[in-house]
Regions:
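Conserved pre-ATP/AMP-binding loop-to-beta segment of ANL
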Residues: 5-30, 37, 62-68
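Conserved AMP-binding A3 loop
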Residues: 26-52
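Active-site loops of AMP-binding adenylate-forming
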Residues: 45, 212-216, 224-242, 279-282, ...
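Conserved AMP-binding/adenylation subdomain of ANL enzymes
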Residues: 49-68, 75-182, 192
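Conserved ATP-binding/catalytic segment of the ANL
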Residues: 253, 259-319
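C-terminal boundary motif of the adenylate-forming
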Residues: 255, 298, 316, 337-364, ...
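Adenylate-forming
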Residues: 272, 306-333, 365-417, 437-439, ...
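Conserved C-terminal "lid"/linker of ANL adenylate-forming enzymes
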Residues: 343-345, 392-403, 424-493
Length: 493
């Protein structure tokens, strides 16, 4: 392939450029449609180019030389277009296109082949990478684990000792620690990765700290298809609870904030969509007369200008008592207290109190993406701490092993009582961090298998499909709300 234009090709390019106006539609993006039919977002040439340039300018302090990235997200996802196609064009990156089943269990295999220097991922992707790193550590020798523990402490301290929260000073201890953890990073294909982005949902502070301790800084961001992609990016790794500051060229405001300063996040700038294709009514609902795009996300701005995401308006749980509760905060706290839990889904709309559906971490079939009955190493280790030596979910829950034709409704889930007590203790700890009494979880249920794309609980970008999950497990939810069901989490905490 020629690396330079000959006169004829250049003339052809000029001719095509003259046929295109900056305000014409360049890209159609389908929204995820987790609560209904997807809408089609129209993005103009100007919106796309502006967003790429704003992103590029904002990440200036970080490495911007040509590198390697890997495309594995569905290309109808705006983040995939931005970080796996368009940004690489601007930076001159080499792009590896992953196996079509990368998100069904083959992600690590593809990362090992591509060896990217930068990567974009949704939180669940980083959770899976973290799990693989923990497995690699656990399977290493005692000396390696000892050195790794020291190295992670040094690396985390190196990042947090740096006042601006950017790249740490390259002291001798930092360099030695970095070399120690490089072995584990290489095992998951991130041996060369210098910069990672996280979007789609907030990445937990716990996960961010773990990746910093492995010398893998992850920059959180906030954006939307309707906003042309990214709108905020973390420029300081020390801001673990935020999604960063607003990018250059973007305006943000919090609409109708409550007493805590939380309200709907609204955005304005050149990146905003033209509208929804053939849906003028929804367009006017999204973009007001002053040009503000209403994101549907709830959050607040801290005094240092960082944006903090609380959750989605459509996911807000409104209890029978009229309390508006963002479930994401509660779910993240629960997962932080219970390392054996892969998914936590809070339920309580129009109910007197909150309950939570939990799944224990199990292995996933790389070929089909379906959950195995075998428990993940994190779960096995957690069970051993309870003096339980079972290695299968069916044994822990006393149900038949999962198969593609599995129907849990014919089974009664009776978890091991030691497990019930330990989960209750974890939820009690999480409840101590509740922002109000109404935000305390009072009952829980362990579900018969992990959430996956093939079983329907996760969408194509690995987001939980709340409405689908609540419908699928409606009988379990109703059982939790029966008065005869024991209150596992007491009101008097």
């Amino acid at each position: 392939m020629s690396l330079s234009f000959d006169p004829q090709l250049r003339q052809e390019l000029f001719f095509k450029e003259k046929q295109i106006a900056a305000n014409q539609c360049a890209l159609l993006i389908f929204t995820s449609g987790t609560t209904g039919l997807p809408k089609v977002v129209m993005l103009s040439h100007d919106a796309i180019v502006s967003n790429i340039k704003f992103c590029y300018a904002t990440v200036g302090p970080f490495r911007r030389e040509p590198g390697v990235t890997m495309s594995y997200l569905p290309l109808n996802h705006v983040a995939a277009q931005l970080f796996e196609v368009l940004m690489p064009l601007l930076c001159g990156d080499c792009v590896y296109f992953a196996d079509r089943d990368a998100l069904k269990g083959k992600l690590i295999k593809n990362l090992r082949i591509a060896q990217p220097t930068r990567l974009f991922g949704v939180p669940r992707v980083y959770e899976k990478i973290q799990e693989e790193l923990l497995v690699a550590e656990a399977n290493s020798s005692y000396l390696c684990r000892l050195l790794s523990s020291w190295a992670k402490r040094v690396l985390l301290k190196s990042y947090f000792c740096n006042a601006d929260g950017l790249e740490p000073k390259r002291t001798l201890s930092y360099i030695c620690a970095s070399l120690i953890v490089r072995k584990f990073k290489a095992q998951v294909g991130l041996g060369r990765c210098a910069y990672l982005w996280a979007g789609g949902a907030p990445l937990s502070a716990q996960a961010k700290k773990y990746f910093l301790s492995m010398d893998i800084p992850v920059a959180d961001m906030f954006g939307a298809s309707e906003a042309g992609g990214a709108m905020t990016i973390t420029r300081s790794y020390c801001h673990l609870e935020s999604s960063g500051r607003v990018m250059l060229g973007i305006e943000v405001k919090i609409d109708k904030p409550n007493e805590q300063g939380q309200g709907e996040i609204c955005l304005r700038g050149r990146c905003i969509m033209m509208g929804y294709l053939n849906n003028e009514e929804k367009t006017h609902e999204c973009i007001d007369s002053d040009g503000w795009m209403h994101s549907g996300d709830v959050g607040h701005l801290s005094t240092d200008g960082c944006l903090h995401i609380t959750g989605r308006i459509k996911d807000i749980v409104i209890t029978a008592g009229g309390e508006n509760i963002p479930p994401l905060y509660i779910e993240n706290r629960i997962k932080a207290e219970l390392p054996c839990v892969s998914n936590a889904l809070v339920v309580g709309d129009k109910r007197k109190f909150l309950v939570v559906l939990l799944t224990l971490k199990t292995d996933i079939d790389n070929a089909t993406g379906l959950p195995f009955d075998t428990l993940h190493l994190d779960t096995v280790s957690w069970l051993k701490s309870l003096d339980i030596h079972q290695t299968r979910l069916s044994e822990v829950l006393n149900i038949p092993a999962f198969t593609p034709s599995f129907d849990y409704k014919g089974s009664v889930i009776k978890p091991n009582q030691k497990v019930v007590a330990a989960v209750e203790a974890g939820l009690t700890r999480a409840n101590k961090n509740a922002l109000s009494r109404a935000q305390r979880v009072q009952k829980f249920a362990l579900l018969p298998h992990d959430f996956t794309v093939p079983t329907g609980e996760l969408g194509p970008t690995l987001k939980s499909r709340r409405a689908f999950i609540c419908e699928k497990y409606a009988d379990i939810i109703e059982e939790l709300y029966k008065e005869s069901s024991r209150l596992l989490i007491k009101n008097d905490l």
